[in-house]
Amino acid sequence: MTSSRSIPLINLKDSDDTILPVLEQALTEIGFVMVEGHSVSEHLVRTMRQQLEAYFSRPLSEKLTDCITPDNYRGYIPLGFFSPNSHGATRDQYEGYKLHNETAPDDPICSVCDLYGPNRWPSMPAQLQETTQAYWKACETTSQHLLRLIAKIMNVEIDGFLNLFEQPL
């Protein structure tokens, strides 16, 4: 690391012997690290952005058909949908689309927590689901690589550590 004020950079294509000391120092002293050499391609990021821009540029009436519901807390979030808990506060001014890790409706965790269940995928743009799932897979590959490195730093059994991350939200 060149300075205590800079965020260290690791390249996941480097050897573990090269990465581990930099990663450990970054996470213990700064709490952040920049990562390159990961599995999320620039093309995939660009495609994901294009798909999202195409979705959010659709007319409001079309997006509202995908709106989240009390029964399925996934889908389109219109401007002002959420408000702070304080009375009279300004409603949040963002729109979004809530997706989570895909969980089968009959998975027992769905009865315990409303945040688990199947996603509601919009019909347009047609490739949004495929692109999103490819993006998630690339992010998952990167996170698994980082978690393995962190397990080595912590000197814990890698598979046992990774098992703690099997049920993402």
Language model: regions and residue ranges:
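Peripheral, non-catalytic segments flanking oxidoreductase cores
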Residues: 1-169
